[in-house]
């Protein structure tokens, strides 16, 4: 995925009201930009560190700039825009990077499914095999060298696990794909200390046949892509 034009830089001041972030531009001006991340962003907020943002030419937007990347004090890069995770996953499937998800003749996004009125992030279909339902989650929480998901209690994430288990029970294939958007994360596991119910459901889903995989992202101001499999600790 290429970013055109390339992201511009600033320095983080603060994130507040969930969707707003103040940064200082390279010319010293302080501006408010959109934060496209609904999570707690635990361990992603480092005031005084470098950030990168994109700029939209849509005149209807109140905030034309969107926060895209953050740099940690250790020099790691974090993908802040969780909305890019699905596109990164789709691109990686088409490119053959995600080897577990090859051999299907069609790919669709945001398809309604399940008994809890959900939309699956990616649906792979083929006439010769069961459909493959893929739920994509962006993972950015790093604590003591370990990557965790979620970074806050997620009722929505719990619902998605129940829906995936339902698909397996119906004879379909179900996959939970963690898109790792923190360059310091080397493996992923459930954040039992943050959302014990999610962790319990994740273990249950795995034992019922839901496949759980993770892929690391290589991100820069010029572009991003999924590059390699990342271990999941269950």
From Swiss-Prot:
Name the domain of life.
Bacteria
| Alphabetized GO MF terms | DNA binding
Q: Which family does it belong to?
A: Belongs to the SfsA family.
Q: What is this protein called?
A: Sugar fermentation stimulation protein homolog
The encoding gene is sfsA
């Amino acid at each position: 995925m290429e970013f055109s034009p390339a992201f511009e830089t600033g320095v983080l001041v603060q994130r507040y009201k969930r969707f707003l972030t103040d940064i200082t531009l390279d010319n010293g001006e302080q501006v408010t930009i959109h934060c496209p991340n609904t999570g707690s962003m635990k361990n992603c907020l480092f005031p005084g560190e470098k950030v990168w943002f994109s700029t939209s030419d849509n005149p209807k937007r109140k905030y034309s700039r969107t926060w895209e990347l953050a740099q940690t004090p250790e020099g790691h890069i974090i993908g802040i825009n969780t909305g890019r995770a699905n596109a990164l996953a789709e691109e990686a499937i088409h490119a053959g990077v995600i080897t577990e998800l090859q051999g299907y003749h069609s790919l669709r996004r945001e398809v309604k499914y399940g008994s809890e009125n959900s939309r699956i992030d990616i649906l792979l279909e083929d006439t010769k095999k069961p459909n493959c339902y893929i739920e994509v989650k962006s993972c950015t929480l790093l604590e003591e060298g370990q990557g965790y998901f979620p970074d806050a209690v997620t009722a929505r994430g719990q619902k998605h696990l129940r829906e995936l288990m339902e698909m397996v029970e119906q004879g379909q294939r179900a996959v939970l794909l963690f898109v790792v958007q923190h360059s310091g994360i080397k493996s992923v596991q459930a954040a039992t200390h943050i959302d014990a119910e999610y962790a319990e459901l994740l273990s249950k889903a795995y034992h019922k046949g839901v496949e759980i995989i993770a892929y690391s992202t290589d991100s820069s101001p010029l572009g991003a892509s999924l590059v390699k499999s990342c271990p999941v600790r269950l």
